[in-house]
Amino acid sequence: FLLFFFFSKNCIGQYRNQILFPGENGTHLLNLLFDNYKTSNVLSYTDARVKLYKEIYNVHDTVYCVYSHHGLYLDPNYSNPIDYLSKGGSNNGINCEHTFPQSKGADAGNARSDMHHLFPARAAVNEARSNYPYSEIDDTKTKTWYYLAEELAAKPKTLVDEYSESLSGFFEPREDHKGNVARAIFYFFTMYEIQSDRAFFESMRPTLCHWHMQDPVDSLEWKRTFMISQYQDGKANPFVLDCTLPQRCYCEGLINCISGIEGVKFEGADNLISPNPASDLIRIYLNASDFSITQFRIT
């Protein structure tokens, strides 16, 4: 069989990429993003949630929690999807998560219903997140693990990456939502800095920079930002469109990113391909130059 090792200095891929304002950095770039991507019009908070549940995050009439993948069927003929999914305020109902908490600056004006930072979440998990900053939590210190409708006090034996974690004062989303969180918060702080809690943002910034690289934009995130833009002056989240923006705005020293790799992530020597070990045939599609591949044949 074949065992592959990848060694990469600056290689990461997202679904697609558009370089915005090339050559610009720092404050001037942030001003350009504000001037060109700040929406003047958003839906009401009620209408925004209806769009999220019936269109943006509706998968074959089911809405899934971004933190636990808990899904609820939504009757397409029901007149009030907010009420339908809440299940009377049940812990297993689904409500709306403000990635940048309302108490930290998203409670007024367009910020409250800007869909670029709103996500469906299981009620109990949303409550556990509260207004806590996002953080990497030591697994040995995690208080509660969340997956589907489960809430575990001990570390799960399988599917660990599918779980979100909470600890008093901190919250860690599941692995495949970390990049989405980072890009939503970079967007929010760029567009609504004047009303945002800067200390709250700064406490998360290094972690968000890492998560942006760890979990690049996939096809769903790319599709959804354009779906949202239809209701917000045609303006997508620029941090989804251009993977270099965090580095140029908030994450000085962050490694470079590349585009054109769907479903495969390259993160230094930690990356694994599947299947690995492999036999017979495996295909790898690359769009990068600064990497090396070492192949060992073991008999």
Where would I find each of the regions flagged by the language model?
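N-terminal module-boundary/linker segments of secreted carbohydrate-active enzymes
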Residues: 11-73
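Short alpha-helical segments and helix-capping/turn motifs at coil-helix boundaries
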Residues: 45-52, 79-80, 103-107, 168-172, ...
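Short, His- and charge-rich active-site/binding loops that engage polyanionic ligands
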Residues: 63, 70-93
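Domain-level detector of nuclease and nuclease-like folds
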Residues: 84-258
